[in-house]
Amino acid sequence: MRMILMFDMPTETAEERKAYRKFRKFLLSEGFIMHQFSVYSKLLLNNSANKAMIDRLQANNPKKGSITLLTVTEKQFARMIYLNGERNTSVANSDRRLVFLGEDYSDEN
């Protein structure tokens, strides 16, 4: 499942800009990926992870502006239509799981 977070925060004063930067850094540290300037998404494995993320967002709520959450399935997220721009195909934006085992075993000898 995917959590989509959309927000608008005031940035007129230095204090408001600081709150905006702090919230954005929090989102990035939690694994959110930016789709547009104030639209982020995060891949969640199940409903328990969704509820836990909502709790962490509430604990880090900047209290000003508007923050909206929408949780959709991966199938729904994959059907997103792009009128302009391109789909982000990075590994971080994929629901495929990667497994890293041990050290780097490249062919360098």
Swiss-Prot record:
The keyword Nuclease applies. Keywords: Antiviral defense, Endonuclease, Hydrolase, Magnesium, Metal-binding, Nuclease. Its EC number is 3.1.-.-. One of its GO terms (molecular function) is metal ion binding. It comes from the Bacteria. Its cofactor is Mg(2+). The keyword Nuclease applies. Mg(2+) binds at D8. Pfam families: CRISPR_Cas2. GO terms for biological process: defense response to virus; maintenance of CRISPR repeat elements. InterPro entries: CRISPR_associated_Cas2, Virulence_VapD/CRISPR_Cas2. Belongs to the CRISPR-associated endoribonuclease Cas2 protein family. HAMAP family: Cas2. CRISPR (clustered regularly interspaced short palindromic repeat), is an adaptive immune system that provides protection against mobile genetic elements (viruses, transposable elements and conjugative plasmids). CRISPR clusters contain sequences complementary to antecedent mobile elements and target invading nucleic acids. CRISPR clusters are transcribed and processed into CRISPR RNA (crRNA). Functions as a ssRNA-specific endoribonuclease. Involved in the integration of spacer DNA into the CRISPR cassette. Homodimer, forms a heterotetramer with a Cas1 homodimer. This is CRISPR-associated endoribonuclease Cas2.
